[in-house]
Swiss-Prot record:
GO BP term, pick one: regulation of protein stability
InterPro entries given in the database record: Nucleotide-bd_a/b_plait_sf, RBD_domain_sf, RRM_dom, TDP-43_C, TDP-43_N
GO cellular component: chromatin; cytoplasmic stress granule; mitochondrion; nucleoplasm
Cellular location(s): Nucleus; Cytoplasm; Cytoplasm, Stress granule; Mitochondrion
Molecular function terms, GO-annotated: DNA binding; RNA binding
Main location: nucleus
Protein name: TAR DNA-binding protein 43
Sections of the chain in a coiled coil: none
Free-text domain note: The RRM domains can bind to both DNA and RNA.
Its biological purpose: Probably involved in transcriptional repression. May play a role in the maintenance of the circadian clock periodicity.
SMART domains: RRM
Length: 414
């Protein structure tokens, strides 16, 4: 006649009664049906209080000499299975520990000035139960300082809130652990990645669908106006870190993934002056090379070329003192030319020379000093500072400042 014996995995657990065979033995298959992986039974001896093993022969468990009795029998497992079970129990304990981890205050940055504590509580209540909200205010004025604190009941809610950006009263805000609350040996890794080389036809939905293949995406942010990059926030920081440094193909375009943490840029921008183009002292504007007009006096298509505060001729520069000396020399030279021209006019025109007074001033030709223009109809293509060749006794610039009549030249040769 069969009887029921009490069997359990642990002495402290509630036992299960399993039936025996008609001959009083218990089949090992009967035990493994209730306890998969079991390989035997043991029990605590009432006299010695030591654990005794039950005899097993060809898959059949034989009762002790005194019979099965009311003892509680503990299941035996192979060592490998026991080790796996211990590891499973340890991992389960870690999961339970994480699940019951206490929440902490979160700092909310970037709050609008008009946001009140009630507004803050109503917003975060959509994520879960809120224990506390506080908007920091100035003691003297009573106005908001633009940040506050919030605490939730559940740790899962806290993690979810920290993993995304929040639009509060029309403004994007960030919610994170304060620096003082962050453990130094367990730094909070970023769940956000920077996606560079984006194109304008990439939408937030398309980015979310693409990155969803790597893990849960909680937020996608594309700055407005478009700046060729975006931010993607994952629920798991390990997914975000695994993608950093990768080049991925989205809609046929190669994008680069990097960490979204702010970096200190050691490269300073150049000063406004001295850049290439559009600034004083640079290339392409006043006092430089290019299309300067008026008071810069650069080489090129200068119009007017007033002798102002210094000129640059390639590597050769003229300061105001040298310019004043040049003006004095030119005035002296042109004074002598005026006297010679008046003497020639009294004796009548000769050759191709024309009176000094009838000389026409052409744009981009000649040299301008104050309101006086010097040039010549036969002075050739006299552009800028003396590049024309003289014809006869014409009054042009021949590679220097001053005048050249016949074989006589006065001024500075260059």
């Amino acid at each position: 006649m069969s009887e029921y014996i009490r069997v359990t995995e642990d002495e402290n657990d509630e036992p299960i009664e399993i039936p025996s065979e008609d001959d009083g033995t218990v089949l090992l298959s009967t035990v493994t049906a209730q306890f998969p992986g079991a390989c035997g039974l043991r029990y605590r001896n009432p006299v010695s209080q030591c654990m005794w093993g039950v005899r097993l022969v060809e898959g059949i468990l034989h009762a002790p000499e005194a019979g099965w009795g009311n003892l509680v029998y503990v299941v035996n497992y192979p060592k490998d299975n026991k080790r796996k079970m211990d590891e499973t129990d340890a991992s389960s304990a870690v999961k339970v520990k994480r699940a019951v981890q206490k929440t902490s205050d979160l700092i909310v940055l970037g709050l609008p000035w008009k946001t009140t504590e009630q507004d803050l509580k109503e917003y975060f209540s959509t994520f879960g139960e809120v224990l506390m909200v506080q908007v920091k205010k100035d003691i003297k004025t009573g106005h908001s300082k633009g940040f506050g604190f919030v605490r939730f009941t559940d740790y899962e809610t806290q993690v979810k809130v920290m993993s995304q950006r929040h639009m509060i009263d029309g403004r994007w805000c960030d919610c994170k652990l304060p620096n003082s609350k962050q453990s130094p040996d367990e730094p909070l890794r970023s769940r956000k990645v920077f996606v560079g080389r984006c194109t304008e036809d990439m939408t937030a939905d398309e980015l979310q669908q693409f990155f969803a293949q790597y893990g849960e995406v909680v937020d996608v942010f594309i700055p407005k106006p478009f700046r060729a990059f975006a931010f993607v926030t994952f629920a798991d920081d390990q997914v975000a870190q695994s993608l950093c440094g990768e080049d991925l193909i989205i809609k046929g375009i190669s994008v680069h993934i990097s960490n979204a943490e702010p970096k200190h840029n050691s490269n300073r921008q150049l000063e406004r002056g001295g850049r290439f183009g559009g600034n004083p002292g640079g290339f392409g504007n006043q006092g430089g090379f290019g299309n300067s007009r008026g008071g810069g006096g650069g080489l090129g298509n200068n119009q007017g070329s007033n002798m102002g505060g210094g000129m640059n001729f390639g590597a050769f520069s003229i300061n105001p003192a040298m310019m004043a000396a040049a003006q004095a020399a030119l005035q002296s030279s042109w004074g002598m030319m005026g006297m010679l021209a008046s003497q020639q006019n009294q004796s009548g025109p000769s050759g191709n020379n024309q009176p000094q007074g009838n000389m026409q001033r052409e744009q981009n030709q000649g040299f301008s000093s104050g309101n006086n223009s010097y040039g010549g109809s036969n002075s050739g293509a006299a552009i800028g500072w003396g590049s024309a060749s003289n014809a006869g006794s014409s009054s042009g610039f021949n590679g220097g400042f001053g005048s050249s009549m016949d074989s006589k030249s006065s001024g500075w040769g260059m």
